[in-house]
Amino acid sequence: LLVGISFTMKAQDSLSLFKTLSNQYSQERAFRNNYYYNPASMSGYSSSSFSEFGVGYHDNKEKVYRQQLGNGSKGLTVEARSFQKLKPNRFVWGNASYQNLKTGSVKWNETLDYERIAPYITADSVGGKLNLERYQFAGGYLQNMNRWTVAGQISYSAQMGYRSKDPRMKSTTSDLRVNAGVSYKVFREYEVGIFGEFNKYTQNNSVQFQSLLGRPYVYMMSGFGFSNYLFNGGTRPANTYEEFAYKGGIQISNKQGKDFYFQAAAGTSNNIKGDNETNSYFDLSELKNETFELEGAKFFNVAEKHRLGISAGYSASRKTGSEYGYSMNTASLSQLFKREAYRRENYTASVKGLYQYSQDNFTITATPFFEYEEIKERRLYPNSGQKFVYSYFGLNADYRQKISNSQVLTFQPYFYKRTVNKSINALSTAGNAAVDEWVLQDYLFQASDITTFGTVLRYDFKLKKLPAFFVGAQYQTQKIQKKNNNFAGASIGITF
């Protein structure tokens, strides 16, 4: 790695900082980011090696929000990433990050990774501020052998969330992913590839109380405010989520995806929630998720300075929740049934474009996009549900200006809007006024239009015999229900 870094610094010294950054932060590469899900496609990721280290801080304040996710967060992020060409046919890459965050006003959720495990969360009506630490690292290796390319990547992330006052929630997660891919050059630069992924996820969470003056009631939620009354109200509730997931796909491309690519992937996962408050363990729910994804893109050169691209994609996800029923004999619980009681279907179709104009001292890139999404969510026992149909459209822009051989300024404004085409409320009351109010508030949030404006500004500069430094700032405002949610962030770092 040290040899690779030394080579990188020498190579970048021979180029202007502008050309180095244009390659390192290629907007076209970001446009076809999903193409690199197959690690065997990383051979065309970059024409040169690069590395980056940065530290950032952000403050996100939300006036309109989903209570189970909190009203924003603030905290520190430290991250590093690198892509190294060890030899013409051998590449390695990796990244690592650490976050220390504080999330405010989390309510009706005493778990992490809500979108992954919902609706089977542990919840109470009090909640509070949440401290969260995240660790993540990943590493990949690629080898070219004549017409064959073989590559693999391993990534691991872990979280710890906790609260230092009642209800004293503590949750830890671990997420291991192993990716592998193979591609074969069938003719000239046309390639066919296959890839696969294995994922193992675990979450352990508990809620404890120290106050002698009383405590809130804890629910084992099962969707739309309904809960598992047999396991509700524990004095020291503790749960485990365990998930195994598999995914595989195929890929066809030309010129390492720079001319065109097409890929399809399908996957399945199974997440089981168990109760382990006592010495006994009981399965509470099982959440199965089946996914299917399609994406294709085509790129064109127009004259010498113009580059065009168009991409279209489709994705489908169907989550099915099964719930366990037990006897009421408190001396010894025994399973009576397992039945499907929840389903969530999510279908998305998208199209986006790319236009890039390049000169020796500046580049302009525009990426417009449009997306159509349909979400249907319902449960049985009792019947309840909701449906949303959304349209999204927006524009991401990037302007990079060379000030001198050692100074570059980058300006990235963006805009997007979510429009609710249809929303259907078929919710049933849970019989608890506080719970019903939360469920209705959550529905109204999802049934609201959202308009977002933001911009990123970054200044890179290089001093003699030192790596290049950068400072950056970001601001975003989001309008929802006639109120504004605001985000501000700043970062500093080095590239080499």
Predicted regions and their residues:
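Residues on the lipid-exposed face of transmembrane beta-strands in outer-membrane beta-barrel proteins
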Residues: 78-84, 137-143, 178-184, 248-254, ...
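Outer-envelope beta-barrel architecture signal
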Residues: 45-51, 88-94, 146-152, 188-192, ...
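Outer-membrane beta-barrel "beta-signal"
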Residues: 14-17, 188, 484-496
